[in-house]
Amino acid sequence: MSSFNIHEILEQLYAAKSLTSEQSQAFFERVVQGQVDPIILSSVLTALKIKGETAQEITGAANALLAQATPFPRPDYDFTDIVGTGGDGLGTINISTASAFVAAACGLKVCKHGSRSVSSKSGSSDLLAAFGLNLDMSAQQARQCLDDLNICFLFAPQYHAGMRFAAPVRAALKTRSIFNVLGPLINPARPQFELMGVYAPELLKPIAEVHKELGMKRVMVVYGSGLDEIALHGETQVAELIDGKIIEYTLTPEDFGVQHYPVEAIIGGDPSENKIIIEQILQGKGSDAQQAAVAVNVSALLVLNGKADNFKEGTKQALAMMLTGKPLQLLKTLAERSQC
């Protein structure tokens, strides 16, 4: 990479020409090493956004961030992640975080990668901190929790320290950039299975292609009528990576055996408000809409990990598991273990 030339990259982008995966990787490696001037970074992020980021550019950036991440002792068993880009602006309850604990209670190994809020009042780490989870637990400690409890949480800033170099530019630009889609792609444990929500339908196919380039086994990329998760208020568009191919289809609440509910029925609040709501959901005491919103996302995770034959069966499994209260117990146990 000694021939790396930042001005060539800039000129290429100014001409609306896409970068190769290698060029993108070389550039973002320098970003997370603190070697890129903020003005240059601002120009590149803006040019990429106006042109529209390609799968190759996103893959290169993801590979750069994964290469620079703090290592995680990766297990040799299969495990999964459920995560959204955020940025849908709707401020719903923490569906993917709640779903992670239900899925773990159903027997999946879930390595949840997350950070602070992007668009909601409460990101995954904000919520888990409200439950008493120590976000700074070591990688070894997190791995032990994955082994023993079926679940762990990896706090993105702890594993991607180099992202701090981009933070001032991202804050100043106040707009979505390639970084918004990178978060769900850079779990340092590198799961082979993932349910990933995106904030715009045009991201579905490119992000599925990125997962393929990153060597994932099976992934569902979803956009639920404005939500970065599977929706109850309308259709959910899906791009699924399966057996090395990407297939596109649409899901409705009927496919999961549940009713339609308005999106207003799953709006959340700040972390302390969301904590109360999630506490209810994880023991089957939430509203019908709240229980269903979590159940359909758990169902998709169960199907893509081979733990349910179809979405209706997966939804039934998830709803039944919440009624046992086991998912809440799991969350409390993880919080206790993280403080040791």
UniProtKB/Swiss-Prot annotation:
Mg(2+) 2 binds at D228, E229. Its cofactor is Mg(2+). Its EC number is 2.4.2.18. GO terms for biological process: L-tryptophan biosynthetic process. Pathway: Amino-acid biosynthesis; L-tryptophan biosynthesis; L-tryptophan from chorismate: step 2/5. GO terms for cellular component: cytosol. Anthranilate 2 binds at R170. Mg(2+) 1 binds at S96, E229. Anthranilate 1 binds at G84. Binds 2 magnesium ions per monomer. GO terms for molecular function: anthranilate phosphoribosyltransferase activity; magnesium ion binding. It catalyses: N-(5-phospho-beta-D-ribosyl)anthranilate + diphosphate = 5-phospho-alpha-D-ribose 1-diphosphate + anthranilate. It is an enzyme of class 2 (transferase). Keywords: Amino-acid biosynthesis, Aromatic amino acid biosynthesis, Glycosyltransferase, Magnesium, Metal-binding, Transferase, Tryptophan biosynthesis. Belongs to the anthranilate phosphoribosyltransferase family. Catalyzes the transfer of the phosphoribosyl group of 5-phosphorylribose-1-pyrophosphate (PRPP) to anthranilate to yield N-(5'-phosphoribosyl)-anthranilate (PRA). Homodimer. PANTHER family: ANTHRANILATE PHOSPHORIBOSYLTRANSFERASE (PTHR43285:SF2). This is Anthranilate phosphoribosyltransferase. It comes from Psychromonas ingrahamii (strain DSM 17664 / CCUG 51855 / 37).
